[in-house]
Amino acid sequence: MFGGLSSWLGLKPPEGAAAEGEEPPSRDGDKLSAGAAPSEESPERPVEPTEEQQQQPPTEDPQFLHQAKGLGNYLYNFASAATKKITESVTETAQTIKKSVEEGKIDDILDKTILGDFQKEQKKFVEEQNTKKSEAAVPPWVESHDEETIQQQILALSADKRNFLRDPPAGVQFNFDFDQMYPVALVMLQEDELLSKMRFALVPKLVKEEVFWRNYFYRISLIKQSAQLTALAAQQQASGKEEKSSNRDDNLPLTEAVRPKTPPVVIKSQLKSQEDEEEISTSPGVSEFVSDAFDTCSLNQEDLRKEMEQLVLDKKQEEATALEEDSTDWEKELQQELQEYEVVAESEKRDENWDKEIEKMLQES
């Protein structure tokens, strides 16, 4: 059976099979040769095929066998060529992947796949978001009360690396979101060259990226809070000055109208009482908070100084007027005394004349 199949595919039949197929005739021939004498005498009988001959397939056509052999060779060659090409392709792909992995070019391979396209779109989306955030971000000193001063103080932070290495004090609540402040950090790297150099020197050798920016923005928040407090104190001081100036303007006409009508002695007593009141008012009062006392002192110091100077000037003027009035009274009294002296002298002269005339009259008589 297998011999017929191999002969149909164009392969040579095995020699053992051929020998087995040839054995029966030789045996029959031997038998016939051994029994040659009886066969001559008896009539010829048909030779019956043996079991092996019955099982042996019939002989095939040589042309058909040649075609089958050519077809088998063609299929074998085609399969061999295809297998060789597939093997070479797989080997080449494996070598390319190995080489790309060694050279770090695995991204080039991934870019050619669906995963590479997805990564490209994701990267593009992230870049667009970062661009929008960076365009909207501005330096911390923008829209501040005193931009120039705050800018100089913030830029001065980059000169000392301790501002980046020291963490905020324990217990201080400072909420820092690195993703939210990342665009501002990019803007600051563009604005401050010294900051970029400091970041290159410290990150990640001495401090992590997130800790570096947290400490930096904590110092910036302190600078901005200090500027806000200074501006608030200046506004309070200006409003206090305006209120006091308006109150002073309202009180000036009354004092000017009353002052000339008062006598000098009463003015001195009033001045003393006013000075006592000013001393009492300028004495530090008890306040609930130290900040309240500090604000009142800082706001009223200049006004109190001006008022004291005005009071001293008024006192000097009043003393001068009192002295002038005293001098005029003294002059009047002196003039009166001189007039009385002249009257007495004239009366004495008149008396002497009368005496002389009386003596003359007595002598003549």
Swiss-Prot record:
Residues 52-62 have a biased composition (Low complexity). The modification Phosphothreonine is found at residue 262. Pfam families: BSD. It comes from the Eukaryota. The keyword Transmembrane does not apply. Residues 240-251, 346-365 have a biased composition (Basic and acidic residues). Expressed in the liver, kidney, skeletal muscle and in white and brown adipose tissues. Expressed in the cortex, cerebellum, thalamus, hippocampus, braistem, olfactory bulb, spinal cord and striatum of the brain. Expressed in most neuropil regions containing glutamatergic synaptic terminals. Expressed in the CA1, CA2 and CA3 perikarya of the hippocampus. Expressed in neurons and Purkinje cells (at the protein level). The modification Phosphoserine is found at residues 283, 298, 327. Residues 172-224 form the BSD domain. Keywords: Cell membrane, Cell projection, Cytoplasm, Differentiation, Golgi apparatus, Membrane, Phosphoprotein, Postsynaptic cell membrane, Synapse. Gene3D superfamilies: BSD domain. Residues 1-65, 237-259, 344-365 are annotated as: Disordered. Induction: Up-regulated during adipocyte differentiation (at protein level). PANTHER family: SYNAPSE-ASSOCIATED PROTEIN (PTHR16019), SYNAPSE-ASSOCIATED PROTEIN 1 (PTHR16019:SF6). Plays a role in adipocyte differentiation by promoting mTORC2-mediated phosphorylation of AKT1 at 'Ser-473' after growth factor stimulation. This is Synapse-associated protein 1. It comes from Mus musculus (Mouse).
